[in-house]
């Protein structure tokens, strides 16, 4: 299996677990996907009301992303329909739907995740999604 195919397989299993557990597989991501050093970023860049969706530079801080996400939001689904791999990079394209717990409103959005791997572990991540839909669900 090529490195590209192996990286895609790592993500397929992680996203499968993420969707099926409705966000309950955080430990799996840390054990099986994230490298010792990871740069993890998100399109909102920490803007309220999704302060947790910002840049993280290490695994200890990265727990704050998942803690914030799961404290405020409840996953309805998270699917990846397509993977594009080239060299050490993988792009995952799909969609997701989350309910903001304080308002009960749903944010449904296309989702693009960019990944870079080194030695079978993710060392870089950046996520893109419809921030207008997410912000609207919080009001």
Residue locations for each model-derived region?
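Short, low-complexity N-terminal intrinsically disordered segments enriched in polar/charged residues
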Residues: 1-36, 139
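A beta-strand edge to alpha-helix "cap/lid" segment located at domain peripheries
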Residues: 1-6, 67-139
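Charged, low-complexity, helix/coiled-coil-prone segments
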Residues: 1-15, 51-61, 108-109
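Hydrophobic pocket/interface hotspot
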Residues: 11, 26-30, 38, 62, ...
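Residue-level recognition of alpha-helix initiation/capping sites
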Residues: 21-24, 60, 106
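A solvent-exposed, acidic/Ser-Thr-rich amphipathic alpha-helical stretch
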Residues: 28-87
């Amino acid at each position: 299996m090529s490195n590209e195919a192996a990286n895609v397989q790592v993500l397929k299993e992680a996203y499968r677990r993420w969707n099926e557990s409705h966000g309950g597989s955080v430990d799996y991501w840390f054990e099986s996907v994230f490298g010792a050093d990871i740069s993890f970023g998100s399109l909102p860049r920490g803007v309220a009301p999704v302060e947790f969706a910002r840049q993280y530079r290490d695994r200890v801080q990265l727990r704050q992303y998942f803690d914030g996400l799961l404290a405020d939001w409840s996953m309805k689904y998270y699917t990846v329909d397509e993977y594009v791999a080239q060299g050490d990079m993988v792009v995952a394209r799909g969609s997701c739907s989350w309910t903001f717990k304080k308002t009960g409103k749903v944010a449904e959005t296309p989702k693009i995740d960019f990944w870079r791997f080194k030695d079978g572990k993710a060392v870089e991540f950046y996520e893109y999604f419809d921030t207008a839909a997410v912000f609207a669900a919080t009001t």
